[in-house]
Each structure stands twice: as C-alpha cells, then as structure tokens.
C-alpha cells in the first residue's frame, strides 16, 4: 500500500484528523476532529489530478450532481471542526461529506458531474458567513466593507446619514421601510430592517412590521421607558419578531431593575450589554443574568485594550449628538465608559455569558471588524487564562473556537429568527460561506461565497495574464453583479409583511423570508454561550462579580490580527 507522510499529505490535501491549525497570528489552535475523506480516494482539481472525466468526475446530470464542490476544506462551525468536501446545489448547502464519482470511488455522498464547478479548499478554513445584528445603515458602502470582512447578513435600521440613524438603529415608519427595501434590493447581502419600537400604543409599531420590518428597536434617544418597552414587546409577541434594546443610560425613567421588570420575562436582544455603547449606568451588564435576555457586545470594547477607554469619549460625543461645551452632555458620556465593566465583559464572553458580537456600524462601531475583534478577544483570553476547562483534555482550543464563532454566526441567527436560512454550514441553508487561508484567518478572507456564487474576492490586475499580479485588492465578483446579487440574497421581514404581498407591491427582485420562532427562545438556546451567572456591580467602584467572583483582567498592550496585516 502506498503511503504519504503527514506533512506531505497536509500540503497536498490539507490537514487531516489529529492535525492542528493556528488561526492567523493568534494563540488559538484548532484540531481536526474528523476527516470525511477516504484515504487514497481524495478528490482534487487540476492538471493530472483526480476530478477528470471517468475518474473523480461521473457522467450524471445535475439532477444528481452538485453545482459546486469545495474540496478538502477544514470546516469550522459551532457544531464541530471537520475536514471534508462541501457540496452546494441550487445556492444551498447540500452536504459536508465525501465528493467524487461513485462509479469508481467508495463512500461518495456528494456526486461530481460535468455540470459541477470546483473551488479548491485544500489548506483553507471554511466558515459560515457572519451575521452582524447591530447595523446603523448610515451609508450603502458599509455593505461592501462588511462583505469583504466575511459578513453576509446585516440586521439593523436606518435611512442614511440622518441624525436619527447616526444615533439609533431604526428605520422609522412604513415609507422609509419601503424605500430601504427598494434601495438595497440588488445588494449582495442578506438584510433585515428594524422599525422604531419606541411607542406606548401599538398601532404605529404594527404598521412598521406590516411594511417590512423584521423586528423592532428600542433606543434611549427616542425614550426607552417601561411603558414603551412593554408595548413594544407586546407587539413583538403578536407578530413573532425580535426586539433589540438600547436602555436608559441616565436612569431617567427607572433603573436597570425597572427595565428588567418591564420585560416581564419576554425574550429580548440587549445591545452592547456591557454599557459603553449605551445602557443603564453603571449596571446594565447584570441584565445578562436573566434567561430571557440575549446579550450582545459591539466591537469597540472587544477586547479590552489600553486604548479602549480613551477612544470611546469622542466617539460617543459624535454618535449621540452631544455637545462638549455642555457640562451635562460630557457627564452623560463619562458615565458610559467604565474600564471595570469592559474588563469583565472579556471574561463573560470567554465563559459564555455574553452570547453575540456585532458592530454598531459607524455609530460607535466598525462594520468591517466583527470577525477580527471576536478572535482578538478569544486570543486575549487564551493568553490571560489559558485553555478553557472544556479544552484541557484535547490540548487545543476547539471548544473555545466553537464558542467564539457562534457569537457572530448561529446565535444572532437564532436570536432574530433566521437560523432556518443562515448561521451555520448545515444542509438546506443558504450557501453563504467564507474561505480563509489559516495565516489570514479572521482578517483577510480569500473568498466570500453568497448564495452559492462568489460575491467578492481578492483579485489582481484584470489585464494581467494570471489572476495574481499586483495590485491585489478586494473586488466585486459576478455574484455581486446584475440580477444574480438579488437572486443569491434574501431580505428578512415579518410574516405579516410577507403575507401582505410586499415583494410585489414594492417591485422587489429578491426573495423575502419571514422571521420565525423568535418568541419561544431563551438564553439557553444560545449555543455554547448560555451561562447564567448572578452578576452584581458595585455602584461606587464598578467592580463586577459573577456568582461572587470578581471579574477583572488587564488591558492588552498588543493584539494579533492587527497592523501585521494592514500595512497599506
């Protein structure tokens, strides 16, 4: 029997069971748990390789064969870290398994035919497209920036650089909802718009959901009072949509307990639950003790570094229309920035008490850094606290990696009722996938696949004789062009809007998909991120304790996935 040494095998077909891969220049290492291939029957494309007629390619039509196969990829998802071929058919994930020609190869469950395209995944990591559930739609250029970072779904609100949008994630009113649905129809991105949820009577909220909102957003700048919270959640319960909330920093209409009481045990997504992005000062962080609260962070506080506190004050003054000449405005800003709660946020993420990470795009957050900041946090926690208990036996960071990737993939999908379509690499879901070379993981993807088509990729000089000559930069690919962008993307709306014939009335090209199962979930549904500690905050010192344990850590002086990768 012919054999190959492990290093040669990895160079030709990628890592296999038991091999370890470093993620970028972080201290996070993942180990291959399973390899779906049959040794000796691997498929690979190229001159003199396997995927040729009568060899790894069968004779069947695309009734049986897949449209696309990504060969020998290392899949990193919330459910595991495995090596395999990934089949894509009709823009959706067909299977993670063994590709090839069943006429001549064993254990083939992804059939390659003459109608099958190939993407070489050897030596690459494949992840689900990211979901950013805290978007201020301030400018359309955010979509390209997010896409090239590995995000394929954006949920939030806004109408452009209006003052309200720059502060709050709300697309206010039926007219603006319709116009934003039309404006984004041909963008290569899944989208969902949140209507304004601040009202004490239901009618104005109901009409927004019927006009295409996928949920509602409560924001303190519009008045997040107990009455508006109760009304908004009551409407959400009736329409099966999620509510996102930015609570009352100034504690004008009540304290954190007043807000939690107004929830009445109904599920809610709490934005920037640490508080620097806004929320009851100084103790909004304790909201994540509650099983009905789905807590997320925004990326400027991810992770805690020696620059974090300093950059936040000016950021906050601009985003919330404050005046540095007004003493009360400065005091308002100061009350939100606390190094103690930011440090605790790192640890709460690492232990799974905070469930999601998002951007807060151009409104105290960076739309292209959700993925990067997530893995920088994982690295910092590994450096400061070592392996998680769940990883001790393996000696690699598999559980930590699965915990952190869930924060920007499956968990926001579950929270907003879209996990039946996106959020993981599982059969039947949209083929929204991101391919990474391990050395560039979490900072520079090598390919972004949207609904089965390549939507964006680094590309060299279009006049060159090969694709790689400089200047190489991210460019839109065919999946971003023409009607394909709409055909490979969806917009999430309420079931009521879908049943109202909204697509036809607005003349939309893309498919509308209803959110569902948003009201029957809890934090226990947040995969790998469901810890419910009893959190307390000292009102004088801002010290944070979880089940009595003081949560504190030092700020990072340097981070991976940073200037090493972004010289230009």
UniProtKB/Swiss-Prot annotation:
Keyword Transcription regulation: no
One cellular-component annotation, GO: cytoplasm
Residues given in the record as substrate binding sites: 219
Superkingdom of the source species: Bacteria
EC number in record: 3.5.1.5
Gene Ontology process terms (BP): urea catabolic process
Cofactor remark from the record: Binds 2 nickel ions per subunit.
HAMAP family cross-referenced by the UniProt entry: Urease_alpha
Descriptive protein name: Urease subunit alpha
Cofactor: Ni cation
GO function term, MF aspect, one: nickel cation binding
Taxonomic path: Bacteria, Pseudomonadati, Pseudomonadota, Gammaproteobacteria, Oceanospirillales
List of residues that carry N6-carboxylysine: 217
Subunit and interaction comment: Heterotrimer of UreA (gamma), UreB (beta) and UreC (alpha) subunits. Three heterotrimers associate to form the active enzyme.
Modification comment: Carboxylation allows a single lysine to coordinate two nickel ions.
